[in-house]
Amino acid sequence: MFDTKKVEIQWGGQTLTLETGRVARQADGAVLATLGETVVLCAVTAARSVKEGQDFFPLTVHYQEKYFSSGRIPGGFFKRERGATEKETLVSRLIDRPIRPLFPEGFYNEINVIAQVLSYDGENEPDILAMIAASAALTISGVPFMGPIGAARVGYKDGEYLLNPTDADVAAGDLDLVVAATHDAVMMVESEAKELSEEVMLGAVMFAHKASQDVIKAIIKLAEKSAKDPWEMAPQADLSAAKTKLKKLVGKDITAAYKLTNKSARSSALNEARAKAKEAFADATPQDQMAAIKLVKKLEAEIVRTAILKDGRRIDGRDTRTVRPIVAEAHFLPRAHGSALFTRGETQSISTCTLGTKESEQMIDGLNGLRYEHFMLHYNFPPYSVGEVGRFGAPGRREVGHGKLAWRALHAVLPTKEEFPYTIRLTSDITESNGSSSMATVCGGSLAMMDAGVPIKRPVSGIAMGLILEGKDFAVISDILGDEDHLGDMDFKVAGTSEGITTMQMDIKIAGITEEIFKTALLQAKEGRAHILGEMAKALDHTRTELSAHAPRIETMSVPKDKIRDIIGTGGKIIREIVATTGAKVDIDDDGTVKISSSDTAQIEAARNWIIGIVAEPEVGKIYTGKVVNLVDFGAFVNFMGGKDGLVHVSEIKNERVEKVADALSEGQEVKVKVLEIDNRGKVRLSMRVVDQETGEELPDTRPPREERPRGDRGDRGDRGPRRDGDRRREGGDRGPRRDRGDRGDRPRRERSEGGDEGPAPDFAPAFLTRDDD
């Protein structure tokens, strides 16, 4: 029934298996990729015809993580996979970026690439496997894909590169780098690093490129066994005559437009030239009109690229290494915890930093289960930033991707949660854009955190590099404009500190670049980053020592683990009382770390003292402030040190006699008490009478000690016999004759109600003690 084809290789200490012919057989190409016990299915389908009037390549990539792959049921009300998560969006882009340039120009058939994680073993990450499966499925599908590509993840630990490291390896190491490459050159790089040098980063890319060659060979072997017949491409029409006509018509207009340094003026001039070209083909067929528009764009690219390669002159008049003018301003917004306005040429970002408590952390539900992220960065790109009318609302894939890139750049310099126990949210609202808005987000975000008082290791700056490549001639350009991005061959973003690189992202629009070009771009980017750091330092060169007056304060303390339940109380009673009474928020971790937060330091101090009182042990002889919680006939129970209870006996309330406890004390009354004794069961005996209730100072004990009452000679009581265990009254021995107490008849009988030396009978005495026997 199945015509299964399979290829296996040993790769990075694991067996990589590529299989087709058993699952999703109606797709144009479907591959089941397995690494360890992680399994990803990728299916490719392509439309056989192009929609009328379509002049772009509609490639759509969807990556989906099935919860059953790790034995989990989705959380929340809806128990099924729903819209794409942030990770799914990022991996979809990771697959899309290296394969899109490998389709021929003029191919406009719609293609769907759908990758689904079917099994996840917790060690082998499915994103790399999804990239490999997508490449293999496209290669065997018959569509005009100029691949295949290979992919690899590289870590760096103890001076050595690691192929396909586990999550634990990445966390313990200094690098998490993903590379996609063809046989000849690198196509895409995505990375996060802990301030590594350019040499180490370049070495990691080359290491990944070499490792991906084994994957490419395996895909080619699978294609030799199972590839479908390649599609026949329609011959491209000869447009040389139309191109010559357009060059004569609008060539000079385009050249003049690109000499205008102002973006708005340049756009207006270019639109006029395009309208002029379109008018010249008004009588042509719709297909010819579309072709003419494409030719105008090609003319624009030729003019810009030639000026850069031959003359070294760019659109705005800069040379290839110069960075646009920079203006940075810290504390731009008065009420934000931290803020900055960062402007580089015609690109501008308002960046803010907001500090929160643990309860503000972002909950992330994924294949590995629930986890919480205390650092967030949200990038927003409204349509007005480019002077256009457009959709305004939820972030798209591009915004999610740009935000994550800036997140990686800044994540490496954050303090640990122990050093700075705040939740940090950065936002970047792009108010102007003409290239490299994600790197403006990095610079603005770094300044905003410093303004908020976040103790980052060092400031971070970022720069976007471009490439113009014609044959063997190339020019690497620093701080690219939007037009240079569109018309160039590479978008290469590098961010880092004065000590090294923290993130690097590269997208190639041609069939890859060489090691020489890559090295040149890295070194030129280092020069640009250093310049930008200098400009940022003019606005703020150090982290502020004080937090904003509007930011919450968090104090951290540690308590013994066995005291956690005492702080929480039965059903959370104690901790709720602490929060309700003091107004501070209290979070307790399983390791005994307690975080107390409030914008009022007095509230923090009150909660802290309360908790200290719960976990501390009372000391005999010390004086504490407490609250009366219960009155009984023989005294009062007082709660002190937050969670401790002790008894003040009626005799220890005052130096003078107290007839009724309720006459001297009331429930809820605050009192000062001294610890007299703690018995071996932990019972605490307290005294109020030796403490000044106004000042809390100890008073001298003026009460005379109780004298022993003489009991007289009780005489020889005789042999009481051996004592045995059990009821003494029932089984006790002979106590001997009783001493003669004499005739009581000559003494008057005392009435119990009259009292005597021992005072009146207490009110609570039972009836048989108070009744009249006469």
Swiss-Prot record:
Q: Which domain of life is it from?
A: Bacteria
Query: Which positions fall inside the KH domain?
Result: 552-611
| This protein's record includes keyword Lipid biosynthesis | no
Keywords in alphabetical order, please.
Cytoplasm, Magnesium, Metal-binding, Nucleotidyltransferase, RNA-binding, Transferase
Where's it found, cell-wise? Answer: Cytoplasm
Chain positions covered by the region annotation Disordered? 689-774
Its EC number is 2.7.7.8
Q: Which family does it belong to?
A: Belongs to the polyribonucleotide nucleotidyltransferase family.
What is this protein's record name?
Polyribonucleotide nucleotidyltransferase
The upper taxonomy is: Bacteria, Pseudomonadati, Pseudomonadota, Alphaproteobacteria, Sphingomonadales
Gene behind the chain: pnp
